[in-house]
């Protein structure tokens, strides 16, 4: 993959107006790139961690996440987490668009030892289920502390 192709690909995704892989293929071909097909675009989307999210016009488009590395407890994740709340059964975490699965993966890796039975993530919302042996208020405080300390 050439540096020019990579740069053009990233610039296209930053425009947040391409909803399908075929649209990206066509746009790159119009810029003069040859040998571009859907499977190559699919590999590039995976390689660069692209996600589908809603743009300002509420259209589903491909874009690059701000944070491309795999999250860990020392990553600056606080800016991806917008709100943490709970009811008697679940903790709900609201994130920036496209960040929920990354945050959920981090929480799943922390796991049962910290009181997390499992997570379910959408695009910008995570449901966290506590283990039975951990009070929900205590788990909520642990999760909030995790994101406060990651700046």
Swiss-Prot record:
Keyword terms of this UniProt record: Amino-acid biosynthesis, Arginine biosynthesis, Cytoplasm, DNA-binding, Repressor, Transcription, Transcription regulation
GO molecular function: arginine binding; cis-regulatory region sequence-specific DNA binding; DNA-binding transcription factor activity
This protein's record includes keyword Transcription regulation: yes
Main localization category: cytoplasm
Matches recorded under InterPro entries: Arg_repress, Arg_repress_C, Arg_repress_C_sf, Arg_repress_DNA-bd, WH-like_DNA-bd_sf, WH_DNA-bd_sf
GO biological process: L-arginine biosynthetic process; protein complex oligomerization; regulation of arginine biosynthetic process; regulation of arginine metabolic process
Name of a matching Pfam family: Arg_repressor
Pathway in which this enzyme or protein is active: Amino-acid biosynthesis; L-arginine biosynthesis [regulation]
GO cellular component, one term: cytoplasm
Cell compartments where the protein resides: Cytoplasm
Domain of life: Bacteria
Gene3D superfamilies, sorted: 3.30.1360.40, Winged helix-like DNA-binding domain superfamily/Winged helix DNA-binding domain
Family of the protein in this entry: Belongs to the ArgR family.
Subunit structure: Homohexamer.
Function: Regulates arginine biosynthesis genes.
UniProt-recorded name of the protein: Arginine repressor
Organism of derivation: Haemophilus influenzae (strain ATCC 51907 / DSM 11121 / KW20 / Rd)
Organism lineage: Bacteria, Pseudomonadati, Pseudomonadota, Gammaproteobacteria, Pasteurellales
């Amino acid at each position: 993959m050439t540096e020019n192709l990579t740069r053009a690909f990233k610039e296209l995704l930053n425009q947040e107006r391409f909803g399908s892989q075929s649209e990206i293929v066509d746009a790159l071909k119009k810029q003069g790139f040859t040998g571009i097909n859907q499977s190559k675009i699919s590999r590039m989307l995976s390689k660069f961690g692209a996600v589908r999210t809603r743009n300002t016009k509420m259209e589903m488009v491909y874009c690059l996440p701000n944070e491309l590395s795999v999250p860990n407890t020392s990553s600056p994740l606080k800016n991806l987490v917008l709100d943490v709340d709970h009811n008697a059964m679940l903790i709900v975490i609201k994130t920036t668009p496209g960040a929920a699965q990354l945050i959920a993966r981090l929480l799943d890796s922390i796991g049962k030892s910290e009181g997390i039975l499992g997570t379910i993530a959408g695009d910008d919302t995570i449901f966290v289920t506590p283990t039975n042996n951990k009070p929900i208020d205590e788990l909520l405080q642990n999760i909030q502390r995790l994101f406060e300390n990651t700046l």
